[in-house]
Amino acid sequence: MSKKQQGYNKATSGASIQSTNASYGTEFSTETDVQAVKQANAQSEAKKAQASGAQSANASYGTEFATETDVHSVKKQNAKSAAKQSQSSSSNQ
């Protein structure tokens, strides 16, 4: 086998490993940052709830299953939400 062929084989095997990682790498990863995933899910749910105006749904389901809820940030978000609601209700009168 010439050096040229060895280089080609290395290049193709590397490419196939990368494509395998692209399709399976994160799906079955053992080092998933669970807290980051939960936080991202909670943020996604909060955005959906705000967009649809269903903030009460977020209050009843959003934090119910969280293991490490940041109480301070939840209170802060609730205060913002209450402020927005009072602004919109006063402008509607």
UniProtKB/Swiss-Prot annotation:
Cleaved signal peptide residues: none
Membrane-spanning intervals of the chain: none
Residues of the site described as Cleavage: 27-28, 64-65
Source superkingdom: Bacteria
Keyword list, A-Z: Repeat, Sporulation
Entry's family note: Belongs to the gamma-type SASP family.
Annotated protein name in UniProt: Small, acid-soluble spore protein gamma-type
Organism (species): Bacillus cereus
